[in-house]
Amino acid sequence: MQRTLRRMALSIVERTGKRASELCLVGVRRGGVDVAKRLAEAIADLEEEAPKVGAVDISLYRDDAATALPDAKIGPSEIRFPIDGREVILVDDVLQTGRTIRAAIDCVLDYGRPRRIWLAVLFDRGGRELPVHPDFVGKTVDV
């Protein structure tokens, strides 16, 4: 797992062309937050500075919110830095249908207008229902 995160961190640094201090990693609650923190640490090991890290809770942004909300545990979104004009890397642990990422993008846009939103996922399982494609993938798992 550590090797995969290091490889993803190197790819993020190379492809974005930005210093770590210019990047914002935003993890999707729940699984994406830990991945975002670990990616930030791996980037800091490469760049000697860490990117900012935040988190979004997408419970209210889901397209099935009306049916899912009675059982949903809504947590806080924590983006405590400006994202206007910044490079934001949305981070999740697993990408499959794309619906979670669509909701996460909507949530991020409520905080401002980033220059660009990248997508990093630890596992890409395929099975898309929406046109979502990750920029950085740890491992691809066929379902």
Region spans (language model):
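PRPP-associated nucleotide enzymes
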Residues: 1-143
